[in-house]
Amino acid sequence: MIEKIWSGESPLWRLLLPLSWLYGLVSGAIRLCYKLKLKRAWRAPVPVVVVGNLTAGGNGKTPVVVWLVEQLQQRGIRVGVVSRGYGSKAESYPLLLSADTTTAQAGDEPVLIYQRTDAPVAVSPVRSDAVKAILAQHPDVQIIVTDDGLQHYRLARDVEIVVIDGVRRFGNGWWLPAGPMRERAGRLKSVDAVIVNGGVPRSGEIPMHLLPGQAVNLRTGTRCDVAQLEHVVAMAGIGHPPRFFATLKMCGVQPEKCVPLADHQSLNHADVSASVSAEQTLVMTEKDAVKCRAFAEENWWYLPVDAQLSGDEPAKLLTQLTSLASGN
């Protein structure tokens, strides 16, 4: 229902307009206060890059963060990552992730980013505290990438990158809750780069698509072409589950059943195993896999995806960030 409201298919969005105007008024006032320096943002001693979005829901932001961190690491840059840690329940904040940190403590995306990149990752509702925690333990870090947080103006930033879902784009264009917008589309004029996940990019936007890798068994780490798996049940607890199901079909997999879950939904063995029989093969997203490794069965697999950016702009962006991190 919420997708139909936000896309404009359902007329119910009109009933929510008063709340949307209030949301827009408050969020605009907050940004204006920081712009006019009525409120002061904290500036880190190293450059900060924000990877965020203008809309609620999944846009492919986390794969972009992983791509950015890995690309900078390949250029010899030491990167730290901070996140709010949505859904996390740590005993105290900031929390610096370790190999033993669970998704319940830190949230799904921070654990995924930590496991994929081996970069220092810290979570805190106050992102400046997360930055301080990383720099205290890793003083050699040269640049901070913040996963989400475009609207978290308490943290000063040097570069802003926005990720857009190229198919859904901005829906009906209204602020939450009548539409999907955290900020209006005009905000794109002030950011440094716009990355479009799928769809048809517009002038000045960087095209991106998610490239699936080999399926990985949660228990053994065995890898294989996902099309070799039989009697597949697909499960996705991400912002937009249909994107994952479409990716599987693109890989030649016709799932016997698709199980969409809420983004950041907590998972346990009983709930997951109820979705798949012993004769079937469960294929989930990597984001779900980080929550299921501790209790995985032998017929559970996940399909990792990597962000692939096209054109000349990604190289220019990386050159800019490398120079920034190097102090040039």
Curated annotation (Swiss-Prot):
GO terms for biological process, alphabetical: lipid A biosynthetic process; lipopolysaccharide core region biosynthetic process
Enzyme class, spelled out: transferase
Coiled-coil segments on the chain, per record: none
Matches recorded under Pfam families: LpxK
Protein's UniProt keywords contain Transferase: yes
GO cellular component: plasma membrane
UniProt keyword list: ATP-binding, Kinase, Lipid A biosynthesis, Lipid biosynthesis, Lipid metabolism, Nucleotide-binding, Transferase
Protein name: Tetraacyldisaccharide 4'-kinase
Species name: Shigella boydii serotype 4 (strain Sb227)
Source organism phylogeny: Bacteria, Pseudomonadati, Pseudomonadota, Gammaproteobacteria, Enterobacterales
